[in-house]
Amino acid sequence: MSAALDSPSRSAASPRRSSVGIVLWAVFLAITVSQFHSPLFALPGRLQAWGSLWVAICVQALPFLVLGVLVSASIATFVPASFLGRMTPRNPFWAVPAAGAAGVALPGCECSSVPVAASLMRRGVSPAAALSFLLASPSLNPVVIVSTAVAFYGLPQMAWARFAAAVVAVLCAGWLWLIVGDNSTLAEHDERLGECTPSKPCAATAVAREEAFRDAALADFFPAASYLVVGAALAAAVKVIVPAQWFLGLADTPWLLIAVMVVLSIVLSLCSEADAFVAASFTAVSPTAQLVFLVVGPMVDFKLIAMQLGAFGRGFVLRFVPVVLLSAIASACVVGVVFFGGL
């Protein structure tokens, strides 16, 4: 979510021209056709099972992904970043939970929360509060919680556990940053993530806002959908190829199982509106391990790290990522024990 009335609209041309994205969608469509038993795309045995699971995960997750993108684009277009600045107390300690609450009220994709956080800092919001919003917006928004409830319809407490763990993680990360954060490492990128300028005017008219909304939605949707397709394919492959006994064998070493889910959440880089359906497909792992996957993913993944490097610099990432990762893992484990009775 960019602060549209405070920043230029994003172009969706690049994602749409991505050859990788085109190839991924072509493969996905081919697999979809195969589910209707087309002789042209017929798949044998386990490959058919993989294709069926891949399509099922994508079809379940896609409506929530679209809904999340539309909500994010609406806020990006019509809610100025200055509004968030006015909502945040001047006291940095209380600004952290206030920014977290703003993340619930103003949901957005994790990708788009990075420029919003940068804009908030430039408006005088404390870095800890701005970064708390960066974490809360994709983790605590209502679309994410509803999608989790749908994905885990047989385990309704998972949605509440995810919300509780994310709240704890956001607060811990924000307050820890007040203690260990080095704000001098934050890089200035005013032109790339900055204010309206004569060369980059704000969206002021209704037509401009409509174009900004469309561009913001497309710019969020295509990368997120590509990550969903790839993540669902890998999750389906794990489900089909890796024996359930392997995960069951890790039950005796729950920390190792949790480490596996942490790595998967970082590597897959899924959109938070869709990741619950991928997590639910890992039926052989414990609920707490699934919860760790759901909490870590929207806060720390490869695409977020890359965006934070560009927005804030290497020194910031080297401090911020460990703080967030430890907060997310610890909160998910503690909440998992409370809700599910163990790791």
Language model segments and positions:
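Selected transmembrane alpha-helices and immediately adjacent juxtamembrane segments
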Residues: 2-3, 9-73, 160-262, 321-343
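N-terminal, well-ordered alpha-helical segments
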Residues: 52, 56, 69, 73, ...
